[in-house]
Amino acid sequence: MSKIFVNPSAIRAGLADLEMAEETVDLINRNIEDNQAHLQGEPIEVDDLPEDMKRLHLDDEKSSNLGEMVRVGEGKYREDFQMDEGEDPNLLFQSYLDNVGVQIVRQMRSGERFLKIWSQTVEEIVSYVTVNFPNPPRRSSENKSTQTTGRELKKETTSAFSQRESQPSKARMVAQVAPGPPALEWSATNEEDDLSVEAEIAHQIAESFSKKYKFPSRSSGIFLYNFEQLKMNLDDIVKEAKNVPGVTRLAHDGSKIPLRCVLGYVALANSKKFQLLVEADKLSKIMQDDLNRYTSC
């Protein structure tokens, strides 16, 4: 008959587990007793209550106090919606606008139309500004205000004009540096630069993000390429696409933009693989034809 030997350490471990289990049970029982301590006292009979308790009622002052408490609570809710005094409103507003932009892109990717999204977004932004940015006090001198406004408008006009001139020059610079189509003759210029235009361009690109377009190959054939192969963020693609002449105007009018031309331009400036595969002269002609066809409609 075989003998079974038990390791003493296993016995000690089992005893320790039993002790811990007993302590756990005791702790649970104590917690239950503490939680039910209010039930262990003697019950209060209704007949033992003072006679004055039967005549208790709420008067008008109490009800008015309740109304004041409700109004205070509502005021506290409005204060919670507003910003703290120690926080910079400009930074918070910038963060809010960034979140709004991300939300717009997500809604457009889900299939919602831009005009509906934009109308709702404008209402939200107006509400935010109304709550957090009250009207500043008027200046006593109208001449100072007029002079300041004139200087600001002049600065904004100068900066906007310099930005518009820098966009075509940037496009020409990219076309010259990159080993792509050097002979593109683009006469149109981008003049609109607002969020609605960027959103429309992003919407059209996002809808065709995986669609493959035909491009001329160096091997006298064709190859397929799409926006997804760029490995770029949608925002960066939109910024590059705005440098293509005529794209901003088409997006502002709600027309279709030449996506193959845009893809060729962005890929030529950012993808070395695309530069090695594509035939530069043929690509130049294709991009020019696409641009002329879309802008002439």
From Swiss-Prot:
Provide the residue span(s) of the region labelled Disordered: 134-176
Q: Where is this region: DYNLL1 and DYNLL2 binding?
A: 138-172
> Which Gene Ontology molecular-function terms are recorded?
RNA-directed RNA polymerase activity
The alphabetized list of GO BP terms reads: microtubule-dependent intracellular transport of viral material towards nucleus; symbiont entry into host cell; symbiont-mediated suppression of host cytoplasmic pattern recognition receptor signaling pathway via inhibition of TBK1 activity; symbiont-mediated suppression of host JAK-STAT cascade via inhibition of STAT1 activity; symbiont-mediated suppression of host JAK-STAT cascade via inhibition of STAT2 activity; symbiont-mediated suppression of host toll-like receptor signaling pathway; symbiont-mediated suppression of host type I interferon-mediated signaling pathway; viral transcription
Kindly state which keywords UniProt assigns to this record, in alphabetical order. Chaperone, Cytoplasmic inwards viral transport, Host cytoplasm, Host nucleus, Host-virus interaction, Inhibition of host innate immune response by virus, Inhibition of host interferon signaling pathway by virus, Inhibition of host STAT1 by virus, Inhibition of host STAT2 by virus, Inhibition of host TBK1 by virus, Inhibition of host TLR pathway by virus, Interferon antiviral system evasion, Microtubular inwards viral transport, Phosphoprotein, Viral immunoevasion, Viral RNA replication, Virion, Virus entry into host cell
- Give a yes or no for keyword Chaperone in this entry: yes
**Motif placement: Nuclear localization signal:** 211-214
Composition-biased stretches (Polar residues) = 158-169
Q: Cite the post-translational modification comment.
A: Phosphorylated by host PKC and by an unknown kinase.
Task: Give residue numbers for the modification (Phosphoserine).
Answer: 63-64, 162, 210, 271
GO cellular component, alphabetical, reads: host cell; host cell cytoplasm; host cell nucleus; virion component
Quote the SUPFAM superfamilies the UniProt record gives.
Phosphoprotein M1, C-terminal domain
Q: Where is this motif: Nuclear export signal?
A: 49-58
User: What protein family is recorded?
Assistant: Belongs to the lyssavirus protein P family.
Q: Its function?
A: Non catalytic polymerase cofactor and regulatory protein that plays a role in viral transcription and replication. Stabilizes the RNA polymerase L to the N-RNA template and binds the soluble protein N, preventing it from encapsidating non-genomic RNA. Also inhibits host IFN-alpha and IFN-beta signaling by binding and retaining phosphorylated STAT1 in the cytoplasm or by inhibiting the DNA binding of STAT1 in the nucleus. Might be involved, through interaction with host dynein, in intracellular microtubule-dependent virus transport of incoming virus from the synapse toward the cell body.
What is this protein's name?
Answer: Phosphoprotein
* Gene from which this protein is expressed: P
